[in-house]
């Protein structure tokens, strides 16, 4: 019975729905950044006002990086990071200001990164430090 539940859960996890892509990409990015020596301090951080969300907040050396994770199954419509347009960058900056204010961090120590994930048989992960 338990084996059947595990197989069913695995099938659900592997479905190719966009909401699953995002979650899988965030999980891969989280593990990747940790493997690169980052300390993850927040996942899916939401502002108190509910006006924004940041996928990952990490310390990379002495820099606090606000990380947007973008995931696609292919590059047919461009690389994942191309989805981070000016409007999205503005929302991320607003959410980052909220985090910095609450965490009492110097804004000069802040950086904005993008982790691009392409889900293939062997996922491709690219970390764009200081992307904007």
From Swiss-Prot:
Pfam families per UniProt: UPF0102
- Return the CDD domains for the record: PoNe_Nuclease
Molecular function in Gene Ontology: nucleic acid binding
Annotated TM spans: none
Recorded hits in PANTHER family, A to Z, give: UPF0102 PROTEIN YRAN
The entry sums up its family as follows:
Belongs to the UPF0102 family.
Q: State what protein this is by name.
A: UPF0102 protein Acid_2433
Species this protein is from: Solibacter usitatus (strain Ellin6076)
């Amino acid at each position: 019975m338990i084996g059947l539940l595990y197989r069913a859960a695995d099938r659900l996890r592997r479905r190719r729905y966009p909401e699953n892509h995002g979650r899988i990409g965030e999980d891969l990015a989280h593990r990747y950044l940790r493997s690169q020596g980052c300390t993850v301090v927040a996942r899916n951080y939401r502002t108190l006002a509910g006006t924004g969300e940041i996928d990952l907040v990490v310390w990379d050396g002495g820099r606090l990086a606000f990380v947007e994770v973008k995931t696609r199954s292919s590059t047919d419509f461009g690389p994942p990071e191309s989805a981070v347009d000016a409007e999205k960058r503005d929302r991320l900056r607003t959410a980052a200001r909220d985090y910095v204010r609450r965490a009492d961090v110097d804004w000069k120590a802040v950086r904005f990164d993008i982790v691009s994930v392409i889900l293939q048989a062997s996922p491709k992960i690219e970390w764009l430090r200081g992307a904007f």
